[in-house]
Amino acid sequence: MNKQSVRDVELQGKKVFCRVDFNVPMKDGVVTDDTRIRAALPTIQLLAEKGARIILASHLGRPKGEVVEELRLDPVAARLQELLGKPVAKVNVAHGPEAEQAANELKDGDVLLLENVRFYPGEEKNDPELAKAFASLADVYVNDAFGAAHRAHASTEGIAHHVTAVAGLLMEKELEVLGKALSNPERPFTAIIGGAKVKDKIGVIENLLDKVDNLIIGGGLAYTFIKAQGHEIGKSLLEADKMDLALSFMEKAKEKGVNFYVPQDAIVADDFSNDANTKAVDIDQIPADWEALDIGPKTRETYRNVIQSSKLVIWNGPMGVFELDAFAGGTKAVAEALADANDTYSVIGGGDSAAAVEKFGLANQMSHISTGGGASLEFMEGKALPGVVALNDK
């Protein structure tokens, strides 16, 4: 990583504005999944060890620039306090006199959590005045919110222009793992691209075709490829305007010597529900009024073999409608193949893939689960992430 990190700077007695990603699910004022809070702990603990006065900032949900009571960060402060085992102060603003006073009262190693930064309309507009106001609270800026690194907002990008700006440990790890995967991968290198829409994955497929040895396609987007090959797909998901593009990807793979895998069979259903009638059929046998909602057993076996023979696998997007148990088998098979592949470094690209490995209880058997859905996707597209670009170079 060519950016400075929190390890590279002297922080004793300094006020540090640390942007974290505490955008966690809540129910009735209680955090229901604290994964993202836990992910930030190493950075917070290192800041405390280095004697910093820690000012944490995060967004939560989409309050659209106004105060939404149920999107206040108080439940997050409560959970963070439990995890850290020490007090976490909380203010109801993210800048201004009240925030300044709380920041000035901090002692070395103390922790303060500011209010939801998206309560301010200037946050998502990257308003320079708001960025300056955030910066005025601190001596150093640490960005540990990889999940928001693809956004140029006041607390993720604007602030970095006003104070020393460095990466947190989580940000550093994400950039190192994803960076190495894309620039200097161990081979064979396999990418598994799933999800519903071709249009969401065009950039990723384009960028990865230049880098991978194997490209595996699954999920709803696969049926546009299958239709483009001349097969009937019944009522399966189709983006007719992307069929030419799908063909061109397959051609490009051939030219580059990349093995391009699409499903050879599918689980089809007569209805989009858990209690639909289902059957496994070869890909050219999908009945006219049924839809394919998962990859079939032959495809699972093929994909498993490719995964097992790979040194590096990046996975972004499920193989089927894994939220419904009847169509979760393909996604589970891929997750299990990754869990069983001892010599394979597995990178799970956030979002639905991360949710899937959690659901199947296999998360701790993956080498790296990215904390950023959109951010890891844009990184894999080869795009520069504004929140990273703004940090100080080494």
Swiss-Prot record:
GO terms for cellular component: cytosol. It comes from the Bacteria. GO terms for molecular function: ADP binding; ATP binding; phosphoglycerate kinase activity. Substrate binds at residues 21-23, 36, 59-62, 118, 151. PROSITE patterns: PGLYCERATE_KINASE. Pathway: Carbohydrate degradation; glycolysis; pyruvate from D-glyceraldehyde 3-phosphate: step 2/5. The keyword Transcription does not apply. The modification Phosphothreonine is found at residue 299. CDD domains: Phosphoglycerate_kinase (cd00318). SUPFAM superfamilies: Phosphoglycerate kinase (SSF53748). ATP binds at residues 201, 323, 350-353. Keywords: ATP-binding, Cytoplasm, Glycolysis, Kinase, Nucleotide-binding, Phosphoprotein, Transferase. It is found in: Cytoplasm. PANTHER family: PHOSPHOGLYCERATE KINASE, PHOSPHOGLYCERATE KINASE 1, CHLOROPLASTIC-RELATED. Belongs to the phosphoglycerate kinase family. Monomer. This is Phosphoglycerate kinase. The gene is pgk.
